[in-house]
Amino acid sequence: MGLNKLYLGETREAVESFRRADAIAPRDPERWTWLQGLGRALMQLGHDAEAVDALCQTMDSNPGYLRGKAMLAAAEALTGNLEGAKLHLAQYAAAEPDMTVRRFAAQRSSVPPDAVSPTYRRESERIFDGLRRAGMPD
């Protein structure tokens, strides 16, 4: 439900939904799925330090989640921690050396771009800015 809220541009409601999911099932092996959504939503709202925390928990829950490394790099960059951002982006780039911000944005999900709200698209620009700051080429 949180991802639906996120794509509809109801970002604050998405945060509430992701937090509710975590309160209900904090030991669920798939916990990383809503934690990455929480991290993304928090970043979109400008709560970058909280996003770093959620995305670190995402990576603790699923260390192999490659896209999470890039999202964590973006959040770290937005907090001003460029050293941490570059480290996480380097880990991501080792597996995806040709990734660009444009390609990353296009791969965001299986939801068609015209099905997401303008609010979601606008707020997602913060994440792409974080990726650029971390060193991902346009």
Describe each region flagged by the PLM.
Residues G2-D138:
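Alpha-helical protein-protein interaction modules
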